[in-house]
Each structure stands twice: as structure tokens, then as C-alpha cells.
A protein has these predicted regions:
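Active-site and NAD+-binding cores of ADP-ribose-processing enzymes
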Residues: 1-223, 246-449
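Short, well-ordered beta-strand elements within core beta-sheets of diverse protein domains
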Residues: 227-233
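Short active-site loop/helix that positions an aromatic residue
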Residues: 236-247
Length: 449
């Protein structure tokens, strides 16, 4: 038996575990402080748990065995030394204990082979949460959508601590939008297939270019049928791609100022969430935290992945439930979500911007309420004075509103139409980017090149 005192252990939480297990009659073999000490066998069992949970063997890969490459990570001795911060003599004892723990007398073999094993941190331990998420998806689709206890429990586990999460730069993944922030303007486009529909919408752009009123709008990625939501983007060109206009249609594109502070969950930052600096791999609470962190890194892509039109009802169900949960969570107090555009991504180019969806509580536009109806007069064409010629030259004349109107007003509109920002795009062609695959004719599938 070999004993070590807490002061000879560099890792903070492991030092605490040694302190709890230390006995006065045990003398530390690595210093002369005379403090109570614990058996290094206990340290070895803790190290075994950490290696099994967070590390994987890297010295048994094809590149190492057949091509003599140096394994990724570190050998066992260095790994234990880095984990524990103990004197090298104590590390050697722990390595001996681990080899003893891993040896199977029945087979005469060690768990990690006879050679010196090398270990590297696992790229992800998110599978338990990933499995639970897939079960939740099936439960929502096949069992209960509303008041689903399985979904509520998992969503709280995944999202409940978002308010405390930080990215690799120490920034919150919930960002501020609105006055005096870096995000003050959102762009929104709407597609029209006739001039009459376009002209009608421009007569009340605050209402008809903004979010649909309750009970009218179609279901979307983050909202159910008839549930108001403002879908916009941080750059105008993204709006055109997102509405997927047919050739010959028109798009009315407008900028909306964010006029009050909003809190937006940035899905792009989920992939960069880090653990607190004081997190210890020896602390049992760290494993679920790492599982959650690794799952969050995948979740942003899941929630913003492209969805085929014929699968929208099925695949949007989960993202709609997530949005409902976030919108109603009192402690998080989230007004919307920022997520990557699935329609305007170019492999070799940085993204031009991102999509933004504002939940109902933050989707209202100033002057969109019923107050005398239309707010503007519109003329799409300019005509030659003395001839038959005409050309497309849209112009809008905003009318004065009735300031003494006593109807139902919006108490806290979050957006205001920038009146001079409206642009009409006539869609004359659509360009697609694709990757082609030649279908090879074969006599047997084993003959494929």
C-alpha cells in the first residue's frame, strides 16, 4: 500500500477526495508535512473512472499498428500525471494499480493490451442525450405533443442553464438586440405572385410586410399554424433566398428597426459552449455537464438543418416545441432565436448573415394595429404624359395617422418599419448550386470503382 496526502495532489477536486479519504494513521510517502494520507488505490479507481468516461484508446488504430504513426494524445503515465498533478513516483504507483485493475486473470489479457496504452479525450460523449432526444422526437410525433412530460423534462435539462452558458470567448450565448447594441435592424421579405397583391400589401406595409396576425400565418420552423412570429434576417440577401420565390414573382423587402431591448438565443454559439474553468473531470457533476456541452454542439445544426417541403409537418414539430418552450420559459426570458440560413449557405464563402425569428411577444410592429386601416398610398407604374408608354417606378405616400384613435393599441411593439427601406425585387431567374453524381452501370455491385 502507498499513501499520499492532499497537499501532494495538484488537481483541486481530486485533492478534496483525498482529503475526505485520508486517515491520521496513514503517513504520506511523498512529503514530510505529516498530514493525514489516503491510499493511492483510491486515486487509481478515480482515474479509472475518468479514463473510462472521458478518454478513448488511441494506440490501437490502423495508422499506429500498421504504419507506425505516433498515437494521438499521451501515454498512460503522462495522462495520469496531467490529470492528477501528483509527484512522478506517485503516478508510477497509480499506473501499476491501473494495470492491475485492467488485467483479467481468466483470459490472461489486459483491457488495453500488453503494450503501453495511449489515451486521447473523446471527441464527444453526447450519445446518451442524443438517444434521449431521438426518443423525445418519436414521443412528440406518435404520443403526446402538448403537455408531454418526457419532452418537458429533457428540454429543461438541455436548455434550462442557457442563461449561465458562455462561449469560448467568455460571451453569453444569449445576445442583446435593440438600441445601443450591434443588432439594431432586421430585414424581412414577402413574396407576391401578382401586382395587385403586391400593391395591396404596400398600402399597409407595417401590417402586411411584418408578422402575420394571429390565426392567419402558416406554420414555420419555429411556429405553429396561426401562431404569430416574425421571420427576418440580419442581411437583406438572405431574405430573398429564404422565401424561395418562383420566377416571375415579386419580393417586397423592408428593414425593421428593433426599438426595444430583446434577448435572442444564438444557435450559432451553441457549438462553442465551454465548461466553467473550475470544472473537474473527477467531479461526478462534470459528466452530465460535458454530455450536455457536447450535445449542444450538435443541436444547433439539428435545429437549423434544411427540411424538405414534404417533410415539414413532421420535422418542424420538434423545432416548434423547442421554440414554444423557450418562449414561455420565465427565467430565460428569450424573445427569439438567431440561426444559420439553410438556403443561402455557400461552401467556400463566409455566411452573409443569419436568420432571426422573434416569438409572438416580440413580433409586433408599430402602426400595425387597427387604426383607420391603410397607412399609405402606392403607385407601382409611372406613365408617359402624352403617350402609351409606362415603366415600373414604385412610389409610396405615407398618410398621417389618427392620433386621437382610441381603439386597441399595441402596448409594447418591438419593431418599427423603416419607411425609406422598402425595395421591390422582380425575380427573373433562380440559380441553384448542386453536386452531381454519375450513375455507373455495373454487372455486380462488387464491381463499383
Amino acid at each position: 500500500m502507498s499513501f499520499i496526502c492532499p497537499q501532494c495532489v495538484g488537481e483541486r477536486y481530486l485533492r478534496y477526495q483525498v482529503q475526505v479519504a485520508a486517515e491520521p494513521e496513514n503517513a504520506c510517502e511523498y512529503c514530510d508535512r505529516g498530514e493525514s494520507a489516503a491510499d493511492l488505490w483510491m486515486v487509481a479507481t478515480r482515474c479509472e473512472d475518468v479514463l473510462d468516461t472521458f478518454f478513448e484508446l488511441s494506440s490501437n488504430t490502423m495508422a499506429v499498428i500498421h504504419f507506425g504513426r505516433t498515437p494521438a494524445g499521451h501515454d498512460l503515465h503522462t495522462t495520469i500525471s496531467n490529470l492528477t498533478g501528483m509527484p512522478q513516483e506517485a503516478v508510477e504507483v497509480v499506473v501499476e494499480h491501473l494495470n492491475s485493475l485492467w488485467y483479467d486473470e481468466a483470459s490472461g489479457e489486459s483491457l488495453y493490451g500488453d503494450d503501453d496504452p495511449w489515451f486521447v479525450l473523446k471527441s464527444s460523449i453526447a450519445e446518451p442525450l442524443g438517444y434521449a432526444w431521438r426518443e423525445m422526437e418519436e414521443s412528440l410525433r406518435a404520443d403526446v405533443r402538448y403537455f408531454n412530460p418526457k419532452a418537458a423534462e429533457l428540454l429543461e435539462l438541455v436548455f434550462g442553464e442557457l442563461i449561465n452558458d458562455l462561449d469560448k470567448d467568455g460571451q453569453s450565448i444569449i445576445i442583446e438586440a435593440g438600441p445601443d447594441t450591434s443588432l439594431t435592424t432586421l430585414y424581412r421579405g414577402r413574396v407576391f405572385q401578382t401586382e395587385d397583391a403586391l400593391a395591396s400589401a404596400l398600402q399597409w406595409p407595417e401590417r402586411l410586410l411584418g408578422s402575420p396576425v394571429a390565426g392567419i400565418g402558416a406554420a414555420g420552423r419555429m411556429n405553429g399554424q396561426g401562431q404569430p412570429a416574425f421571420y427576418g434576417a440580419t442581411a437583406p440577401e438572405i431574405c430573398i433566398a429564404e422565401v424561395r420565390p418562383p420566377v416571375g414573382s415579386w419580393i417586397a423587402l423592408a428593414a425593421f428597426e428593433v426599438i426595444r431591448p430583446l434577448r435572442l438565443l444564438d444557435l450559432r454559439r451553441l457549438a462553442t459552449v465551454v465548461l466553467p474553468s473550475e470544472a473537474s473531470l473527477f467531479n461526478p457533476a462534470t459528466r452530465p455537464a460535458v454530455e450536455r456541452r457536447d450535445f449542444l454542439r450538435e443541436l444547433g445544426n439539428r435545429l437549423s438543418a434544411p427540411v424538405m417541403p414534404e417533410l415539414q409537418d413532421r420535422d418542424y414539430l420538434v423545432t416548434q416545441v423547442v421554440a414554444d418552450y423557450l418562449a414561455a420559459h420565465c427565467r430565460l426570458n428569450i424573445d427569439g432565436i438567431i440561426y444559420p440560413s439553410a438556403q443561402s449557405t455557400h461552401p467556400d464563402e463566409p455566411p452573409a448573415g443569419s436568420n432571426v425569428v422573434l416569438f409572438r411577444k416580440a413580433s409586433e410592429v408599430a402602426d400595425a394595429e387597427e387604426r383607420g386601416g391603410e397607412t399609405a398610398e402606392i403607385a407601382l407604374w409611372e406613365f408617359e404624359e402624352d403617350g402609351p408608354q409606362k415603366w415600373f417606378h414604385p412610389a409610396i405616400l405615407f398618410k398621417d395617422r389618427d392620433e386621437h384613435w382610441y381603439g386597441c393599441r399595441l402596448f409594447h411593439p418591438a419593431l418599427s418599419l423603416r419607411r425609406d427601406s422598402i425595395v421591390i425585387h422582380e425575380i427573373s431567374a433562380v440559380r441553384y448550386e448542386s453536386k452531381s453524381y454519375k450513375v455507373e452501370c455495373v454487372f455486380s455491385f462488387n464491381d463499383r470503382c
